[in-house]
Amino acid sequence: PLPEIILNKVREGEALGPVMSQYTGIDEIGRKEGAIGVFTKGVLTRSGVYHQAVVLALSPFHNAIYR
């Protein structure tokens, strides 16, 4: 979950990237570690999580056990 102060700004229509940049001081954070990287202190990265999501989503198409 997002911290309430960040969630409120997103609910008001602001994009998450600029809001996170404002609070972290990291320019263009969305092109770097992303909010996920900040919230997990670098344990997870934005690109790593997206990679895993795509692999999991495509696994039924590449594994005979699903047929």
Swiss-Prot record:
Q: What class of enzyme is it?
A: hydrolase
Q: Which InterPro entries match?
A: ITPase-like_fam (IPR029001), NTPase/PRRC1 (IPR026533), YjjX_NTPase (IPR050299)
Question: Which segments cross the bilayer?
Answer: none
Keyword Manganese (UniProt): yes
Query: What are its cofactors?
Result: Mg(2+); Mn(2+)
GO molecular function (one): ITPase activity
Give the quaternary structure: Homodimer.
Q: What is its EC number?
A: 3.6.1.73
- Its name, as the record gives it, is Inosine/xanthosine triphosphatase
Q: Which UniProt keywords apply?
A: Hydrolase, Magnesium, Manganese, Metal-binding, Nucleotide metabolism, Nucleotide-binding
One Pfam match, given by its short name, reads: NTPase_I-T
Q: How is the cofactor bound?
A: Binds 1 divalent metal cation per subunit; can use either Mg(2+) or Mn(2+).
Q: Which domain of life is it from?
A: Bacteria
- Say if the entry is tagged with keyword Transferase: no
Give the family, as the similarity comment puts it: Belongs to the YjjX NTPase family.
Describe the task this protein carries out. Answer: Phosphatase that hydrolyzes non-canonical purine nucleotides such as XTP and ITP to their respective diphosphate derivatives. Probably excludes non-canonical purines from DNA/RNA precursor pool, thus preventing their incorporation into DNA/RNA and avoiding chromosomal lesions.
Q: What is the lineage of its organism?
A: Bacteria, Pseudomonadati, Pseudomonadota, Gammaproteobacteria, Enterobacterales
The Gene Ontology biological process terms listed for this entry are: nucleotide metabolic process; thiamine metabolic process
* Catalytic reaction equation(s): XTP + H2O = XDP + phosphate + H(+); ITP + H2O = IDP + phosphate + H(+)
